[in-house]
Amino acid sequence: MLLPLIILWPVVFKCSFASLSDPENWNCPEVSPSGKGSPACVGPAPFLIFSHGISIFRIDLEGTNHEQLVADAGVSVIMDFHYNKERIYWVDPERQLLQRVFLNGTRQERVCNIEKNVSGMAINWINEELIWSNQQEGIITVTDMKGNNSRVLLRALNYPANVAIDPIERFIFWSSEVAVAGSLHRADLNGVEEKILLQTSERITAVSLDVLDKQLFWIQYSRDGSNSHIYSCNYDGGSVHLSKHLTQHNFFAMSLFGNQIFYSTWKKKTIWIANKHSGKDMVRINLDSSFVPPGGIKVVHPLLQPKAESGTWAPDQKLCKWKQGNCRGSTCGQDSKSYSCTCAEGYTLSQDGKYCEDVNECAFWNHGCTLGCENIPGSYYCTCPVGFILLPDGKRCHQLIACPSNTSKCSHDCVLTSDGPICFCPEGSVLEADGKTCSGCSSPDNGGCSQLCLPLSPVSWECGCFPGYDLQLDKQSCAASGPQPFLLFANSQDIRHMHFDGTDYGTLLSQQMGMVFALDHDPVENKIYFAHTALKWIERANMDGSQRERLIEEGVDVPEGLAIDWIDRKFYWTDSGKSLIEGSDLNGKHREIIIKEDISQPRGIAVHPMAKRLFWTDMGINPRIESSSLQGIGRLVIASSDLVWPSGITIDYVTDKLYWCDTKLSVIEMANLDGSKRQRLAQNDVGHPFAMAVFEDHVWFSDWTMPSIIRVDKRTGKNRVRLRGSMLKPSSLVVVHPLAKPGAQPCLYQNGGCEHICKERFGTAQCLCREGFVKAPDGKMCLALNGHQIPAVGSEADLSNHVTPGDVLPRSEGFEDNITESQHMLVAEIMVSDADDCAPVGCSTWAECVSEGENATCQCLKGFTGDGKLCFDIDECEMGITICPPTSSKCVNTEGGYVCQCSEGYRGDGIHCLDINECQLGMHTCGENATCTNMEGNYTCMCAGSLSEPGQICADSTPPSHPMEDSHYSVRNGYRECPSSYDGYCLYNGVCMYIEAVDRYACNCVFGYVGERCQHRDLKWELRHAGQGRQRQVAAVAVGVVVLVLLLLLGLGGAHCYRTKKLSSKNLKNPYEEPSREGSSSRPSDSEARMASFPQPWFVVIKEHQNLRNGSQPMALKDGESADVSQFSSPEPGSVKRTSWRNEHQLYKDTEQGCCTPPSSNRGTGSQSMEQSFSVPSYEAQPIALGVEKPQSLLSAKPLLQQRAPDPPHQMKLIQ
């Protein structure tokens, strides 16, 4: 188990190196001979220190923070640095002094006096020693950092110079010169094992070490001094390599870091940066004008002075390091003889002497707070209750009594105290020394934080970053994580790319471009969109320049601005010739006019997809900055005053700030999205700004006065840096990075390139594999675990789920292979100041300044002619020097070139024109049953062997077929299947179809998804179906309740029937069983006889009313009639009202229809027996069913009603 850990332990702590172009998010170089790697760790930004004249300067690798550290360092300076001590040490041979200063330029002091003829110096940062060589005495001396305890390390050397050491490997290197021969030497730090690495007949003038790759570099001059070269070898003197591509003739000094070499030359006041292996990716840092070139150069970074491994420390240091293992969360005190653990202020050592514990200052009442104290790790702060504020001393609380008027001009607020009015600050801010200004989160500089300022206490705060950004070591700046960002910009005749520090400067598209001012990038499909002002069309292409396709070819006049809505998948452009703003989807379909009223000369345009707003500049009669919704409604004027030619415009999506520039006024301004808090960032020193971009902490804009790209701080407008290099009219700047356009979904396009699962994280596509698979080495495909060899740990295959580096690249993998060696290599120049050799020459806009030494000349660009100061366009079409095919195209002249405009029926790339097969593509107008035949530049329609006109319908010779409705056809109801090239166009199982009526491809989305490509989840559908689900649940519950109630009612009804039946069987007697009490022997009436003649059973339904009175009695009726029982005491003839039995409650036949059935016995009859047998309960409005068999007379029911009170009429029906 321990063996793999031991093997992998060095790998875990190695950081690989890819690039050094981001000043705030630097990748740590990998310690390997190849010098190649991938971004893996983050370190502080490196910077340069160099001598220039008699001063020492520092500058960032991007040209920022150029400042003087030492004003009078001496004429010939030999220097080195100690990173942990943050010091620069230098030797002034003329004054014979060793001096030092902090890296920030403070506390300059003399260390000691030294002897004459010092020819080289280096610092041993591990043993805390200074080593220098004396060329005349032939010795190398070692002293401590104060210049004391000197001892000679090496003697009897031949003119030693250019000392360099590697304390990790414990080697010292130096150069010597004897007669006409030069040589390189090596020894260990004990002064033994001296070895000659190389001997040459030429002079060696400078030596530098690459401590990361363990390489030795040196500058070698020819004897006559006419040329020089840079060589390298390993620490043993083997593998000597000549850097052929570094073609400068007068190398002076150099330094190395990672994959780059930094060097200066004798004749130019510049510092060059190039790839140390190939000599390419050259960048020139142009310094202030001076009559001397930069002298010694050193790159400052902690990786250039790494910590030592075990075995390289001094004995005392070893002991402290061994003791340090017992100190947890503390430090080892090296000044103590016991080498015990020590703790920082605010902590105390634990009883076992190994831990540092926090001291609770609030518990000891020695904090000095008047009302409240809050302990925090390592410190504390005072608090105040509600209604009180903490005074600036941070201890006392005072009741909040506002000053009558803010006469003290406090930046925040004022409180009235016994000592008078005092300014105070909100939580997270402190009062400055002036007693009025607050610094912290409430200050204009946001507490020095580039993004978030987070209050920690009333007097402290810390900086934070938005998701996707990393806080840098300065604890203030935020840098974007992920791949290295770069710039895209239209350069009039071509499209170029460049990293922020000027490296990787090249051309992306250059063939048949015409004039291009409008450009933008789609991060989802990784394509660029650009508009031609001369050719009057809009194109798009891949990032490697391939697959160019025209989107808008008609109705375009002067498109000068273009913006991509990467979320809603549309793009918008300004047309100053037609004075309108238009938009369409990313395929050029569904074109619509957005703004056409009250607009004069629109130029720059930007879109905010999250805010659903468009922003644009208008350079016309009423110059202004405006915005509207994406549909062109809700227009809002952002700015209309102090504007002349507002040109470029851009949006900071992190802070929701709007930036624009005015070409005529030469100003850069910013404001909120609604136009509030408008302020100027820069003025007068920005040339003629044309286009803008913003990312991280900087604003980029192009300058047409001195064709270049300038960068300033986006909050202050300071730290101006100019990038230039053979530029014409740079415009439409675009920053390419996943976080530059937040919210992009790269997984929407071709599943992000992933074979299985694609997940988006901060704008990048992360590929995952399903269970049972692992990622292939390309990071996109998946390999099955069964039957495939899984790459071993440490191989090139990344089996994790992290995003692979380089997902966003300025070019495709094979782009460099297509570049011929003869292609001109672009060289970017970082200009610290605007003073350069080309400034007084005054080259034409269409010319390039070529500076060689003290001379500078102007050369007209390709496609132009002149003396360089005046250049004129060459009309290639008129001169007949084009290659446009005359039969299929027309030559159109552009500035610096030409374009072959294809004739109707042809399509091309601007040079070549190919015939369009209208028949195959379905672009013909042949009628039904006609045969389309393609021709060169045209097509014909044939009807049964005879020629027909386009649109003519041919007679059908075959009977029409009637397909079944459920059959599948490629064309139905104006819809047609999409071609195979559109596979994957519709996402989430959507079905692609082509709608002929509108000439557009559309997606039929499955339920739950919406959007042009079904890329969005339908939240309304989800909410609607969630509501329907809840309704269905409620309905199910309601149905269940109803069923239960019905079952309960049925149970109650059955119980009631059973009880009624039981009571009837006990209490009711058959009227036919007992004789009449009155002894009546009268003959039954006709109706009674008629009723008695029926053998089937009968039952009576009696409907009672509330006002049924005593004495009411039912009447004997004929079959099928009803009687109204009126208010009477004895039956009277003619008092019965007969009605139809169908309209009232009835006397029903057939016992199965009743609620209950009487006994079926057939016994004696008579009214007397009925009177004694029936008992009618007094239920209100309730029908009562009574079963009888062959009743003789209904008059026998009279006794049943004699005891009741009089009621309203009662109706009965008798039905057979």
Curated annotation (Swiss-Prot):
Disulfide bonds join C320-C332, C327-C341, C343-C356, C362-C373, C369-C382, C384-C397, C403-C414, C410-C423, C425-C438, C441-C453, C449-C463, C465-C478, C747-C758, C754-C767, C769-C782, C838-C849, C843-C858, C860-C871, C877-C891, C884-C900, C902-C913, C919-C932, C926-C941, C943-C954, C978-C992, C986-C1003, C1005-C1014. Residues 316-357, 358-398, 399-439, 437-479, 743-783, 834-872, 873-914, 915-955, 974-1015 form the EGF-like domain. The keyword Calcium does not apply. The chain crosses the membrane at residues 1034-1054. GO terms for cellular component: plasma membrane. It comes from the Eukaryota. LDL-receptor class B repeats lie at residues 86-127, 128-169, 170-213, 214-260, 485-525, 526-568, 569-611, 612-655, 656-698. It is a single-pass type I membrane protein. Keywords: Disulfide bond, EGF-like domain, Glycoprotein, Growth factor, Membrane, Repeat, Signal, Transmembrane, Transmembrane helix. PANTHER family: PRO-EPIDERMAL GROWTH FACTOR (PTHR46513:SF5), VITELLOGENIN RECEPTOR-LIKE PROTEIN-RELATED-RELATED (PTHR46513). Interacts with EGFR and promotes EGFR dimerization. Interacts with RHBDF1; may retain EGF in the endoplasmic reticulum and regulates its degradation through the endoplasmic reticulum-associated degradation (ERAD). Interacts with RHBDF2. EGF stimulates the growth of various epidermal and epithelial tissues in vivo and in vitro and of some fibroblasts in cell culture. Magnesiotropic hormone that stimulates magnesium reabsorption in the renal distal convoluted tubule via engagement of EGFR and activation of the magnesium channel TRPM6. This is Pro-epidermal growth factor. It comes from Canis lupus familiaris. The gene is EGF.
